[in-house]
Amino acid sequence: LRSLVGSEMCIRDRYTVASIDELYLFLTNTTAVEYIRNFMKRVRKKESSVILASQNLEDFNIEGIRELTKPLFSIPTHTFLFNAGNTDARFYIDTLQLEESEYELIKYPQRGACLYKCGSERYNLIVHAPDYKSKLFGDKGGR
């Protein structure tokens, strides 16, 4: 991961995006978490970004790793937050540094509804997929 993504993003002058899906697979490795955190800070200087994707916020709340993962939520300049599911509300609010009013916008599941954070600005978004994408992903939560 480090050599492939690092060299690719550093060789290009700018506008490169890397995505890490199923992030929970890396969270038990402190070296990987530190690398991801440092990498996220460096790529911003090249107008590039790293997209982190995880289904469960509680995966970041592992004893001994919590202190390393918390900064991952303050680094991104753009954040899309969807309904938290069964995650404890206080934990969700504290971890993602939300106001109560922001949490209220995504407290209940609504198809396509999310809170978009961009710097100090907040937007309540409804994401719509074009028909051709809806056919690809279906209407059963991505299946």
Where do the protein language model's features map onto the residues?
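Single conserved hydrophobic/aromatic residue that forms the stacking wall/gate
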Residues: L1-G6, C10-I11
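A general structural motif
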Residues: D13-Y15, E47
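Walker B catalytic acidic pair
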Residues: Y15, D21-L23
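Residue-level marker for buried hydrophobic side chains located in beta-strands
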Residues: A18-S19, L52
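Conserved ATPase-coupling elements of RecA-like P-loop NTPase cores
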Residues: L25-I36, N61-G64
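Conserved ATP-driven motor cores of ASCE-family P-loop NTPases powering translocation/secretion/packaging/pilus
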Residues: F39-L125
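Charge-patterned, long linear interaction tracts outside catalytic cores
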Residues: I126-R143
